[in-house]
Structures are given as C-alpha cells and as structure tokens.
C-alpha cells in the first residue's frame, strides 16, 4: 500500500508529464472510485482496472509499448497505483488531443457517446468543485490547449 505522500507524487508526476491539471486527475479518481487490485467487469466483456478504472481495451497497446505480455500489463495497471495513475493520465491527454478540449477529453475518458460522456464530465467537475480543487471550471481553461501525448504511457 502506498502512502498518501507517495500517491501525491504519482499524481503530480503524471500531471507534469502529460500536461494535465492535477485537480482533474483527482476528480477522475474520485468519480471512478477504483482501488488497487480492483477489476470491475463491464457488460461488453472488458474490465476496468485499479484506481482510475483503466479499461482492458488498452492492454494490447500497453503490452506492446512495455514489451511485456498482456497479462503482465494488466497486472501492472491493476495492482500498481502509480502505474495506473500514469496510464490514466496518458489516456486523458490522448482524449484531450483527439477532441481539442479538456472538457471533451474528460467526457471521452469515460465514453465518446455524448449522453454518457457529458454526464461523466459533469460528475468530475462537480467532484472537483465539491473538494475545492477548483473554484470554477473556467479555472481550467489554460489546460484545454492540445499538446502531443508522449509516447510512453505510465
């Protein structure tokens, strides 16, 4: 188990690496509600893993990048909070770049289907405001500028 201080280092490192506001990472962590070692089964047969509930659809790409079997990538993402946070933040940055927007990136982290993604984005924004991570969503405008996603997830 990691200490709160170690997790804070993971969050701030991921935020810096992928140019994502730490408050957004914390908001997603709160909404996802995952834990180290957790694997939640989805109706489509995939699983969501660990604190940021990373979908197993990402395992082939991660396994190739890390040059490990998919089962190893899955264990790493599920069982290591820092790896999970790094991968989740990398995915969020990719979605931000695809959509050209922080807000749509947050929605697409969950689903590119507007009726699901928009509800999710609102939950993340509400969590950030509730925990006083931001005063107003406009505080995040500077983060909306697309940047290249680094090639290394996690």
Task: Identify the residue ranges that each predicted region occupies.
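Catalytic glycan-binding domains that act on GlcNAc-containing polysaccharides
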Residues: 1-153
